[in-house]
């Protein structure tokens, strides 16, 4: 299969597993989480990811929201629909990043093997006690009221207005087991609104306002429709469980239980309404927790078949145990009004039917309907149609017409018929109650007998509406909009709206619970205000008032009044952050139901720019680079105005926006502007990289000013006692601070933060990169801060011009010769031949003092000596020569910062110092660490999976040792950043230290390539990497004590000789980079620790009430995949 076709196929599978689409900034991450690779759009010939996506309209559909967010959706394809459905069942859209997991495994319904005991409680989630026993299977028929067990807040935590805004027409509609639930206040019955045009929210809200002292009493009754449903549910459960006594039939639930059940049902309806195409019941707890930040009681999952008004349950034909849930079908039915009496539920037909009475007189059609109407008045809860013949014969001692039940529609003029599940043969009959005075008016000969329940409710609704209109202003004033919660994810996305200074940048968070929820709310606002003719503009306004504003393009937005004039008001759009003057006629009262979503516009502070926050040039640069664009954000401090760093992730590399803006406002007059064909003397070469790139300092105004400021800072620190305020407490990438090296303070920029102790820095004025401890950095004193950060970096990146093309890659000998010749020589000279602005590099001829200005004796000509370019095998160059001056250099020259700095070397511990005694001669006899401890077969252990290829090959790490590994990695970074590189002949299958992606790892050398690269295996993480041979160093003895952490593993319980790409992708997504519990089946020992192997069962215990056995899941997946194939 061609790569383009394979990428399209994988992309479609990823998109089909997200029915609501994937935002463009998250698409690469979602694709990689499932496939292990990035989308190779550049290899396919496209400059950007978006360009590639638009080139495959048959695979992806792109939509742009009003906020500017681009969302990708899958196009329909029957070929992969089944696989995508399986992926959707198992994937988690929000990866767990915390290290705390729950290792308490629950009892499984079916076990493929005999299991005794329970796992250790070492990965307990917060809130679980360590002695927590194996939980029991939840009761499927009864949910008890125990505090917060239903996954909703307790009554005491609810704000006073929650009761008004969350209740719907299903109030107390479903309470299993109990027959009667009542509401009363001062013995007054509150009618429930059943008019089809009445908004249930407004109706219930108005009722609660009328009866503010309302309490739920266990001594009243629900309306007949609710009684009917409870009776039917109760009877169905009792008939199926006659041998089990659950509760006394007439005992009502506590009010808090009923209220919680109602809120849970409303929440489930909201979730289902967002998934019109159905949702697997196994995924519902995940969506519930993600949306409401609460756990859903597993017992509720057993109740859905008894909640037809909440959802429709469907069992797929695939034979699986999972069920599909759909939104409930809506019915427009007229319900009768509640009477104040407690009426027993309608009798169900007895198991043994009594035959019709013989010899009973025939019933005439007219008399029959009157008798049916009279009979139904005795059953205010309704009567099943199947029970009507017996009740009729028992009451009137007459024969029931045989064809009457076959044509129930003929009775519609004397009763209300409620068909169940659309079945015309299954219905409940209700009496049509006339007005209380109907009989008197009829006897008086007046023709007013056409009043029914509908007209009564209409009159009451008009009355209620007037009361609501009067109290809505007061209610709105008292309604508090919840504060905006900062996202918990590591790097959320934000849309930058506007800014007046860098300390108050207006942003909006992008995501499902933020921008997507806002768009949904605005659509509801448009629906409400456009189609409600009774909504009128506000008449009186005041500063601070919340409004709904009819903005441009017929959009309805939330706004707050800033100031008022005669016919115009100035408002701030609270979800967008900008202000506007509008006419008062466009402002309407904001309905309370639109106050539940937090104001989406918020402010942030850009880290590192605080001292220049009001600088007009800086504000202009930040505005041009950020406004109207979406960025990933690193939140450094969570506060009312959080401190953040913005990153542009649209290109190949992440761009630090804060650092880019800071460099853009540097004083251009202080730069060294190189002119082509110009000659410069007294040039200092400050750094030489392994690829031949040089960094030079050219005398200029900026360099002189920098040296003066650094000298003043040295005097300042010498005279002033060093206090904790000058220590760097919050390091972040792009921060500029000071580092002391060789008796001088130098400017450094943090380029990478490894941990709370170690980080990488680049010396701005020499180009050197090294790793240092956080404790060795210092803040720039405030009095010098603004002056020193506007000075541009004084290190100019250069390369030697006109080198022969045959030279190719620089050899260690060539780099070493160049360092010995010119490094730290302060009086070199250069001639500029070319300035490459795009790459930021100057092409130069370099001269030592005695050879200037003869071009034939330049460094460019001398370095072409053929002996320097012989590619010797396995030769390492020594960095110690970087501190050695050339014969022509002055004795007082400053050495390269960070390469051999005494102060930095002293910061290493004595233990590390003593461990580096002549590794070159003793490398072959170095001892290996002991093998890592593994549990015995049949025992559990807590593991982390850093790498997973397929169920037949993955890598595990013991969870309890991970913190020791992190400490060791920090020490290796600090040690190898300052230790000299050693000459050593690398050998295959030997252990070394290698630098991989800015971190040092313990590796096993697997092979030596001819292009200067070596293949290594990370002994602690299980990854195979290719690194430059120069980045391989001897492994110090102090780093050989901790056992190698990576152990190769195989999944037990599944048999498959060849794993497909799709199956491997599913397995990798489910276990890679996750903490799990492993049940050891077999340990295969070996003399080499990296050749040990273990066969384990894996269990995902991250869910509170369900354990996911990976082998069961993969077995089910293989069965489903075989059906597709």
Curated annotation (Swiss-Prot):
Name the residue ranges with Polar residues bias. 127-138
| Ranges where the Tudor domain occurs | 540-597, 730-787
Keyword vocabulary terms for this entry? Cytoplasm, Differentiation, Phosphoprotein, Repeat, RNA-binding, Spermatogenesis
Provide one Gene Ontology cellular component: P granule
Q: Which residues carry this modification: Phosphoserine?
A: 346, 886
Residue ranges for the region (Disordered) are 126-157, 881-904
A Pfam family the protein falls into: OST-HTH
Give the span(s) annotated as Interaction with CABLES1. Answer: 920-1125
Q: Which SMART domains match?
A: TUDOR (SM00333)
Kindly report the protein's main subcellular placement as a broad class: cytoplasm
Q: Provide the HTH OST-type domain boundaries.
A: 3-76, 260-329, 364-433
* Function recorded in the entry: Component of specific cytoplasmic RNA granules involved in post-transcriptional regulation of specific genes: probably acts by binding to specific mRNAs and regulating their translation. Required for lens transparency during lens development, by regulating translation of genes such as CRYBB3 and HSPB1 in the developing lens. Also required during spermatogenesis.
Sequence similarity: Belongs to the TDRD7 family.
Its quaternary organisation is:
Found in a mRNP complex, at least composed of TDRD1, TDRD6, TDRD7 and DDX4. Found in a complex containing CABLES1, CDK16 and CDK17. Interacts with CABLES1, CDK17 and PIWIL1.
Task: Report what the protein is called.
Answer: Tudor domain-containing protein 7
Q: Which gene encodes it?
A: TDRD7
């Amino acid at each position: 299969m061609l790569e383009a076709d394979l990428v399209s196929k994988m992309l479609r599978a990823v998109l089909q597993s997200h029915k609501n689409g994937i935002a463009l900034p998250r698409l690469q991450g979602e694709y990689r989480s499932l496939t292990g690779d990035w989308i190779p759009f550049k290899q396919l010939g496209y400059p950007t990811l978006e360009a590639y996506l638009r080139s495959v309209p048959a695979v992806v559909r792109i939509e742009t929201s009003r906020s500017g967010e681009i969302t990708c959706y899958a196009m329909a394809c029957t070929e992969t629909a089944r696989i995508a459905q399986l992926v959707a069942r198992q994937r988690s859209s929000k990866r767990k990043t915390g290290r705390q997991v729950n290792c308490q495994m629950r009892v499984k319904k079916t076990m493929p093997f005999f299991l005794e005991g329970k796992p250790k409680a070492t990965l307990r989630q917060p809130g679980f006690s360590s002695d927590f026993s194996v939980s029991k299977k939840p009761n499927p028929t009864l949910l008890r009221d125990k505090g917060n067990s239903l996954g909703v807040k307790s009554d005491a935590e609810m704000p006073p207005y929650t009761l008004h805004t969350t209740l719907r027409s299903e109030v107390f509609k479903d309470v299993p087991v109990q027959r009667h639930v009542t509401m009363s206040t001062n013995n007054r019955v509150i009618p429930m609104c059943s008019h089809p045009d009445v908004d249930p929210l407004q109706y219930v809200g108005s009722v609660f306002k009328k009866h503010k002292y309302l309490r739920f009493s266990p001594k009243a009754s629900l309306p007949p429709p609710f009684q009917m449903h409870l009776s039917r549910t109760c009877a169905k459960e009792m008939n199926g469980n006659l041998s089990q006594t659950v509760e006394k039939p007439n005992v009502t639930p506590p009010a808090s239980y009923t209220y919680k059940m109602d809120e849970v049902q409303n929440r489930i309806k909201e979730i289902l309404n967002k998934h019109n195409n159905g949702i697997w019941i196994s995924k519902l707890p995940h969506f519930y927790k993600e949306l409401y930040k609460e756990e859903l009681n597993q017992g509720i999952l057993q109740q859905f078949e008894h909640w037809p008004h909440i959802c429709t349950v469907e069992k797929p034909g695939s034979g699986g145990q999972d069920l599909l849930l759909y939104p409930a079908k809506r019915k427009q039915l007229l319900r009768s009004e509640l009477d104040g009496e407690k009426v027993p539920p309608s009798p169900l037909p007895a198991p043994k039917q009594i035959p019709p009475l013989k010899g009973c007189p025939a019933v005439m059609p007219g008399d029959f309907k009157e008798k049916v109407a009279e009979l139904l008045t005795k059953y205010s809860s309704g009567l099943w149609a199947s029970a009507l013949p017996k009740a009729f014969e028992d009451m009137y001692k007459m024969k029931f017409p045989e064809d009457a039940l076959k044509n129930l529609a003929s009775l519609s003029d004397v009763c209300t018929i409620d068909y169940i599940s659309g079945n015309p043969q299954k219905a409940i009959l209700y009496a049509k109650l006339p007005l209380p005075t109907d009989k008197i008016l009829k006897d008086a000969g007046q023709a007013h007998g056409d009043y029914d329940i509908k007209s009564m409710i209409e009159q009451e609704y008009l009355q209620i509406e007037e009361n609501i209109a009067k109290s809505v202003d007061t209610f709105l004033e008292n309604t508090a909009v919840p504060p905006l919660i900062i996202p918990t994810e590591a790097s959320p996305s934000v849309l930058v709206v506007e800014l007046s200074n860098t300390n108050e940048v207006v942003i909006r968070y992008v995501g499902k619970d933020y921008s997507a929820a806002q768009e949904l709310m605005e659509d509801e606002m448009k629906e409400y205000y456009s189609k409600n003719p009774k909504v009128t503009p506000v008449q009186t306004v005041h500063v601070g008032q919340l409004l709904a504003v009819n903005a441009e393009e017929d959009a309805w937005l939330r706004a707050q009044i800033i100031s008022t004039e005669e016919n115009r008001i100035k408002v701030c759009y609270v979800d967008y952050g900008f202000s506007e003057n509008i006419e008062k006629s466009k402002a309407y009262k904001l309905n309370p139901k639109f106050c539940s979503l937090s104001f989406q516009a918020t402010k942030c502070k850009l880290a590192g720019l605080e001292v220049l926050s009001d600088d007009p040039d800086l504000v202009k640069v930040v505005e041009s680079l950020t406004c109207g664009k979406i960025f990933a954000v690193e939140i450094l401090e969570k506060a009312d105005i959080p401190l953040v760093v913005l990153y542009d992730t649209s290109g190949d590399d992440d761009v630090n926006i804060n650092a880019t803006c800071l460099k853009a406002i540097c004083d251009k007059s202080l730069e060294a502007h190189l002119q082509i064909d110009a000659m410069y003397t007294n040039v200092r070469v400050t750094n030489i990289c392994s690829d031949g790139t040089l960094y030079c300092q050219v005398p200029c105004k900026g360099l002189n000013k920098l040296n003066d400021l650094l000298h003043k800072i040295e005097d300042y620190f010498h005279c002033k006692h060093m206090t904790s305020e000058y220590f760097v407490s919050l390091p972040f990438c792009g921060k500029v601070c000071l580092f002391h090296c060789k008796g001088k303070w130098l400017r450094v920029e943090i380029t990478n933060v490894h941990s709370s102790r170690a980080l990488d820095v680049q010396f701005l004025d020499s180009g050197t990169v090294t790793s240092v401890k956080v404790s060795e950095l210092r803040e720039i004193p405030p009095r010098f801060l603004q002056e020193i950060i506007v000075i541009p970096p004084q290190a100019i990146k250069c390369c030697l011009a006109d080198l022969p093309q045959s030279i190719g890659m620089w050899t260690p000998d060539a780099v070493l010769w160049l360092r010995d010749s010119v490094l730290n020589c302060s009086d070199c000279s250069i001639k500029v031949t070319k300035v490459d602005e795009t790459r930021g590099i100057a092409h130069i001829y370099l001269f030592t003092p005695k050879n200037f200005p003869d071009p034939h004796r330049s460094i460019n000509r001398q370095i072409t000596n053929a002996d320097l370019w012989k590619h010797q095998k396995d030769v390492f160059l020594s960095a110690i020569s970087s501190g050695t001056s050339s014969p022509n250099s002055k004795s007082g020259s400053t050495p390269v910062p960070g390469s051999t700095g005494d102060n930095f070397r002293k910061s290493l511990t004595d233990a590390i110092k003593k461990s580096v005694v002549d590794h070159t001669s003793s490398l072959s006899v170095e001892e290996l660490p002991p093998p890592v401890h593994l549990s015995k077969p049949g025992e559990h252990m807590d593991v982390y999976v850093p790498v997973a290829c397929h169920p037949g090959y993955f890598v595990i790490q013991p969870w309890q040792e991970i913190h020791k590994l992190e400490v060791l990695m920090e020490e290796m970074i600090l040690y190898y950043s300052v230790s000299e590189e050693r000459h050593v002949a690398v050998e295959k299958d030997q252990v070394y230290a290698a630098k991989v992606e800015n971190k040092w790892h313990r590796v096993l050398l697997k092979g030596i390539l001819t292009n200067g690269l070596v293949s290594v295996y990370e002994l602690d993480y299980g990854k195979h990497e290719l690194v430059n041979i120069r980045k391989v160093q001897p492994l110090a003895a102090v780093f050989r004590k901790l056992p190698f952490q990576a152990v190769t593993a195989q999944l037990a319980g599944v048999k498959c000789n060849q794993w497909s790409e799709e199956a491997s992708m599913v397995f990798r997504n489910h276990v890679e980079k996750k903490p799990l519990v492993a049940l050891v089946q077999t340990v295969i020992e070996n003399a080499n620790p990296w050749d040990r192997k273990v066969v384990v069962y894996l269990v995902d215990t991250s869910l509170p009430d369900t354990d996911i056995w990976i082998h069961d899941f993969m077995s089910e997946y293989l069965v489903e995949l075989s059906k597709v194939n």
